[in-house]
Amino acid sequence: MGITLKNVSYTYQAGTPFEGPALFGVDLEIKSGSYTALIGHTGSGKSTILQLLNGLLVPNQGSVEVGSTVITADSVNKDIKQVRKKVGLVFQFPESQVFDETVLKDVAFGPQNFGVSKEEAEALAREKLHLVGISEDLFNRSPFELSGGQMRRVAIASILAMEPDILVLDEPTAGLDPSGRKELMRIFEELHRAGMTIVLVTHLMDDVANFADTVYVLDKGRVVKSGQPAQVFQDLDFMESIQLGVPKITKFAHELAEKGMNFSHYPITIEEFKEILHG
């Protein structure tokens, strides 16, 4: 299942003295089975797009097509609820997403809310908690007693338990140590390989290079560049002009080029750089 935004604009508190335009005529396509990254500086519109993807917000103008469901300014709650089941959104701050008495109840809540029996919901919860690396001895603990990294995993499991077609991730590894970040990114990559559509918002350009097949660059509420990461990251000057930059190895290759080394194109991963050196 994919998502298409057509000429989408959004203004917070529209029609009031406090209105704040956030998006302007955005066109964007997330293809079924893709791993799409959305990148942009603070205030670029990334978070607004994420909330539009799963119906937390509806566009003031334009449409958001999720599979066969079309969301516009006039959409009814029935359509929006279906979108929320298909598109799972993991917020950047997990404490805003967990709430129940125990870890197991928290993860089982979502499936039950969509009509799954208590027994089946608990089975799904156990499966997804194991998937994200939460051990059974934590199942009956309060989620608020967990570490930040564990709480993040519980929040992800609670979304996966609803078995969405699309997983939307807002800075999913923020605040994690390197090993925790690597493990979570591995889980997302496995989900993608199994056929799930992934949408990733991140400030880490190396993650975009290593995992995404498509990237959209946002600036001041508009899409200013899009394409494959290998294409987008060739324009180092532009990416730095909007305070994003490029992967570390791309920056390093650019510095080598300034010292006389020839590149037909700048590598975006370490593996690609090795191939160029040995090619």
Swiss-Prot record:
Q: Which UniProt keywords apply?
A: ATP-binding, Cell membrane, Membrane, Nucleotide-binding, Translocase, Transport
Instruction: Indicate the principal place this protein occupies in or around the cell.
Output: membrane
Q: Does the keyword ATP-binding apply?
A: yes
State a single Gene Ontology molecular function. Answer: ATP hydrolysis activity
Listed under GO cellular component are:
ATP-binding cassette (ABC) transporter complex
Q: Name one Pfam family in it.
A: ABC_tran
EC assignment: 7.-.-.-
> ABC transporter domain spans which residues?
3-245
Q: Which InterPro entries match?
A: AAA+_ATPase, ABC_transporter-like_ATP-bd, ABC_transporter-like_CS, ABC_transpr_CbiO/EcfA_su, ECF_ABC_transporter_ATP-bd, EcfA2, P-loop_NTPase
Q: How does it sit in the membrane?
A: Peripheral membrane protein
Subcellular location, record wording: Cell membrane
- Per UniProt, where does ATP bind? 40-47
Q: Which family does the record claim for this protein?
A: Belongs to the ABC transporter superfamily. Energy-coupling factor EcfA family.
Annotated PANTHER family = ENERGY-COUPLING FACTOR TRANSPORTER ATP-BINDING PROTEIN ECFA2, HEAVY METAL TRANSPORTER
Q: Which NCBIfam families match?
A: ECF_ATPase_2
Per the entry, what this protein does is: ATP-binding (A) component of a common energy-coupling factor (ECF) ABC-transporter complex. Unlike classic ABC transporters this ECF transporter provides the energy necessary to transport a number of different substrates.
Report quaternary structure and partners: Forms a stable energy-coupling factor (ECF) transporter complex composed of 2 membrane-embedded substrate-binding proteins (S component), 2 ATP-binding proteins (A component) and 2 transmembrane proteins (T component).
- Name this protein carries in UniProt: Energy-coupling factor transporter ATP-binding protein EcfA2
Its source organism is Streptococcus sanguinis (strain SK36)
Its taxonomic path starts at:
Bacteria, Bacillati, Bacillota, Bacilli, Lactobacillales
